[in-house]
Structures are given as C-alpha cells and as structure tokens.
Amino acid sequence: MSERQGGQEQDREADGVTTEGISEMSQTLQALADGLPVDAFAVLGPHPLADGRRQVRVLAPGAEAMGLIDSRGKLLARMQASAIDGVFEGILSIEGPYRLRIVWPDMVQEIEDPYAFAVTLDESLLLQIAAGDGQALRRALGAQHVQCGEVPGVRFAVWAPHAQRVAVVGDFNGWDVRRHPMRQRIGGFWELFLPRVEAGPRYKYAVTAADGRVLLKADPVARQTELPPATASVVPGTDTFAWTDAAWMAKRDPSAVPAPLSIYEVHAASWRRDGHNQPLDWPTLAEQLIPYVQQLRFTHIELLPITEHPFGGSWGYQPLGLYAPTARHGSPDGFAQFVDACHRAGIGVILDWVSAHFPDDAHGLAQFDGAALYEHADPREGMHRDWNTLIYNYGRPEVTAYLLGSALEWIDHYHLDGLRVDAVASMLYRDYGRAEGEWVPNAHGGRENLEAVAFLRQLNREIAAHFPGVLTIAEESTAWPGVTAAISDGGLGFTHKWNMGWMHDTLSYMQRDPAERAHHHSQLTFGLVYAFDERFVLPISHDEVVHGTGGLLGQMPGDDWRRFANLRAYLALMWAHPGDKLLFMGAEFGQWADWNHDQSLDWHLLEGARHRGVQLLVGDLNATLRRTPALYRGTHRAKGFDWSVADDARNSVLAFIRHDPDGGGVPLLAVSNLTAQPLHDYGVGVPRAGAWREILNTDSAHYGGSNLGNSGRLATEPMGMHGHAQRLRLTLPPLATIYLQAEK
C-alpha cells in the first residue's frame, strides 16, 4: 500500500467510514439513483461524521453543479458530483441550517434540502387513522401546507402499505420518479415535506408495487385536480376563503321547529351551458341558478356528485377524487363562493355523495399500491357487476377513515347542509345484483353487509355529533328497516330516506290512460300504508328521465292538453302528500325529452305558455308549502294526515286532510281528480265547520288549464262524511288537483 493510499484509508477511518462501508454505500446510492426501494433519509441529507462535521448528499439527476449556502446566499461548501450519476456529496464544517444552490441547465435554484427535515406527521395521527378516524385522516393525508420551523412548504402524505417505495412526482421536479422518494412510517403511511412548494403545481405519487411495477397514482386525498381527461392532482391553495354565511350556519339547529324541505336536484354541468356548449363555472352558476331557485321558492339545491370523476357520462356517480370538487366548473374556492352565495340567498346545498363504489381507472384507487387496498381482493366481494366498479372494503379501518374524512371534509370545509348517500341498498346487501354463488355470506351466514352497516351508522353518528342540523339522506330502494331510526334503537341513523316505492307506484299510475286508472287505484293509496315508517323524501329524480323514458311531461298519457294537465295534477298531489319533496331540473317547466348530460336543458320551451304554466305552478306549490304549517310540520307523523276519500277508484279521486299535529295553523284539504271528466257536486268530508277557500287549482288558466273550479270560497254542510263531521260539495276539474284551506 502506497503512502497516499494509506493516507486515504486513515481519512476514511477518521470519518468513520470503512472501505467495505464505501462499497455498500455506493450500491445504496446507485439503487437510489436508479429509483429502487431505498431508505432515502438514511443516505440523503446531512449525516454526522466522527470529527463533528456533517456529510451532505443530494440526489439531483440532471444538475450541472451544486453548493451549500446559508440563508444569505453565502457559499458554505462546494458539492462534488460522485461517480453515481445525479448524486452530489459535500462536507459541511459548520453547524446550523443550510440551503442548496443547484445549477440546472436552464436555471439556478436555491432551496432547502427536503432530506434535512425531521418527520412532520405526528405518529398519533397515523394510529388514529389506522383505528378508523376520519378527522385524523383529513388532518394528515394529501398535500397539506405546513411550516417546518421558518420554512413554508407542502407535506405530502399517502397510505400505501404494500408499496416498496413511494415518491412524489410533479411540476416541481420535472416528473422525475427518482428525485423525491418519501419516508416510510408505521402502518404503511408515507410522507415527505417539500420546502417552498406553493399552490398550483400538478403532482402524483409514483408507487413501486411489491412486484416492482411503478404505478403513477393521483392523490386519493387531493383537494384539487386538473381538468379531466387529465388525471393529475393539484397542490391546493391555502384555506383563506372568507365566508359570509354566519347567520345561515347559526340557524342550522336540529332542535328547531321542522321547516319545509323542497329540493331542486341539479346536474351542474348541464343545467345551462355557455355558447360553446361547455359547463358553466361556479360564479356563473351562482349568478343564474340561485335567482332561479329563489324565484321557484325551493329551499335547497341538491347537486349530483361534483366530487372529481374521470368520466362525465357517469354523471359524477363514479368518482375518484372524494376530497376535490371537479375542475369542470373551476377552482375549489369557486365552489365555496357558490355555497356561500346560496346561503346568503337563503338556500341550502346538499351534495350527492358516493361511498358505495369507485371506478377501476389506472390512476385511481384500484390496486393503489399494487394490491387490493381500498377494495376487496375477492371479486365476489369487491366488484359491482351491474356497474363494473369496485366496492370499498368497509371492514378496513383506513378505508372507512378515508370515507368518513371525505364526508366530514365536504360538510366542514364547504359548509354543506346535507349529503345524499347514493346506492345505499348496494352497500347493505352482499348479494346485491348477484346470483347464487357469486357472493360471500357474512360471518353469520347472512346476506347483510355488517361492515357497511357499521360504517353507515358511524357516518351518521359523526355527522350528527360534529355538525348537528346537517341532513343525511339515504337513497335506499329496499325495505331495510329503520333507515331513519335512531342508532340507539337499531337504526342506521339517517335523517331522511328516498321513498322509491311511492315514486315507482305513482309514476306507474300516472303513465296509464285515465280510463285504465280505476283498476290500479291502490298504486296511489298504498304509499300511505308506510308513509310514516321512515322520514321520507318523495323523489322525482334524474333516474326517472333517462334511458329513453322521456321527460316527466313526455311520460304522461294523452294529447298535449292532457299531458300538461296530468303533470300539473301529479306535481300538486306530490306536494300535498306526506314526505319532503325533490324534483329534478327540467320537470319544473315540462321538458319533453330525456335529460342529456352533455347539453343544456331545453330552456326555449318556456316560450310556450303551457310550459310557463307548469313553472308558475311549481313556484306556487313551494310558496304554499312554505306558508302552510299543515304541509310540513307533520309530514313525517301520522297525526298530520287523515283520509277523506281513499276508495273512489271508479272516479279516480283521492282526497285527504293535512294537519299541523302540534295544533298550529289550519288544516288543508287536497283533492285530485285523475280522470279526464269533471265531477260536479262531489262530496268530501272535512274536520272543521265554516268557510273553506280554494287556494290552489292546477286547472287554473293561470297554469294553462280550463279554469274550472270552486270560485274561491265554499261553506261546509253539517253532514257527516268520510269519518268527518262536516262536508264540502266540490267541483272537481278534470285531471287536476285542488287545495282548500279552512279559514281561521
């Protein structure tokens, strides 16, 4: 050994590094430079030497030169390019922080070293997520703006327990999968703080699966995304939106007297479109939609899913970005502005929220870390054959934390007033849409999905605890008992449930020729057998006007006059019937055609007087609902309803009384004649003597009808009828519903 070689060996030994260690380190650095699974924090960044100095290593493929500088830009040490491409090494003789000065071919960058920072995620948060805590997941995962000491930046964090390696790639590192490998934490979580990253860059995670495949995945907890069909996540802005809806939020009290609930269901991308047939942005929607909803006196807007989704033709019901508003309408702040404007206008906002399934797009949740993670591994549990989508594994706490965190995020961050949970029936039953042998029984041998039941209860429990007064509405199409019953009583704890049975029965009845209706009268009356078993919403939703059925008006029988008359009579019957109301956009003015998600509603139809008449009627129905306690205070209580005429199938007449069960206000009588013949001198029993006034008549010329009615005011006769002490003798116009109210 030469004298020089001996000196080199002594230097290395003084630094605490042996020849064998150098060889091992070279292999590690080579693996790191090749993007292979290596503990990056074990080799990159500053590491103490035996003599008190620090060795600094940086991986910067493509850099031409590098130095270490202080906060004022003074050079502290020059970094040497090692034999391994992209790896720079240097010795730092002073204590304290340092920055990197990196010379790239087209720029000089001065930045802190990401690998000089300690962990930024509290281990307790990770343990809480592993126990199913959605609030902890909201605080921990995704791209979060944080400050490490005096250095601002973004902490990226993701759950990928089967991964060998995870790296952040994006606009800030040239999408180079080698540059920024993340730190592995307990429970399969990965994190990395990138200093000085601001809002706006696109990013993804490069996930190395157990078999070595590198998967480019969007962030499951991204708060912002780029515009589809592009699939990257976007670093969001800081949470600085200035809300002005304090008065609205303060009155959202579940203990208050029941209020009217009338929901206008909207697909934001097709309610109206711009001159280039593109969806409106949130500010434009606010300018146009909010005054329209105010004009029609709806209490709430319900948005079809606006969580980010790759395929517009799914209407939003196959989402992948459960924490991000779709970029189709602009920025997340734009959506916040929309909700804020709704609240200032006195309108609540409900979001359709999908926790039943997700699509299998390569950039999404499917096989997120190379293995079944969010979904079940067994397709008998993990795949919806009806929709070719994947089912969440509700038995995995991290998955339920992900879903719970999403629900809480929308309610908290965007001040939403309710969630309508989609496809609940598909969650509750393991054999939903499956033949014998295509599903796996639960632990007790049954068909119920016990894990999904537990998740739904936890969802409703947490929303009620953290955000009292927020609605949770189940789209549940079976007879599962107690959907809206208290969890303590064995129920699921939803505030409301869609009444799919009422919708199917009554629509089927209305689609029949009036001459045939006498034989199907029970389709009108059967819903009252169970109307008070749950807190129901009566839904005429988007599902009723697609797949060739035509619009609601187009489904009515007869010539044009009869179609309009049928529609008006049906809507007024619906508004008088027990249950809260939901109407999909377009039905309020009588759209003829199927709803088309790729174009605007047929607003030109409002040039026709009959279409304007339907629109005027809907506004008047909502106004009547708002000012009539008998129509809403007892809408979920049997004490608020009495039959007058339930059995006149021959004349297709239905008549009932609505009361305020708490004794306020005056009763309302609703009578529907669903034949094409007027009925004169028709006796109907009522509970109160004196004058009754016709307050609404769908056959009014005001709405496009023949203007047959009861001249405003009638007096009762002291003759018992239909179980009531008094009766009214009425003129019932054809294909019409009338409301009469006792005078005080």
From Swiss-Prot:
GO cellular component, one term: cytosol
Stated role: Catalyzes the formation of the alpha-1,6-glucosidic linkages in glycogen by scission of a 1,4-alpha-linked oligosaccharide from growing alpha-1,4-glucan chains and the subsequent attachment of the oligosaccharide to the alpha-1,6 position.
GO-annotated molecular function: 1,4-alpha-glucan branching enzyme activity; cation binding; hydrolase activity, hydrolyzing O-glycosyl compounds
Catalytic residue positions: 422 (nucleophile), 475 (proton donor)
UniProt record, GO biological process: glycogen biosynthetic process
Record-linked Gene3D superfamilies: Glycosidases, Golgi alpha-mannosidase II, Immunoglobulins
Keyword annotations of the record: Carbohydrate metabolism, Glycogen biosynthesis, Glycogen metabolism, Glycosyltransferase, Transferase
Associated pathway: Glycan biosynthesis; glycogen biosynthesis
Gene from which this protein is expressed: glgB1
The enzyme's E.C. designation: 2.4.1.18
SUPFAM superfamilies on file: (Trans)glycosidases, E set domains, Glycosyl hydrolase domain
Family (UniProt): Belongs to the glycosyl hydrolase 13 family. GlgB subfamily.
Subunit text: Monomer.
Catalytic reaction list: Transfers a segment of a (1->4)-alpha-D-glucan chain to a primary hydroxy group in a similar glucan chain
Keyword Transferase tagged: yes
NCBIfam families: branching_enzym, PRK05402.1, PRK12313.1, PRK12568.1
Name of the protein: 1,4-alpha-glucan branching enzyme GlgB 1
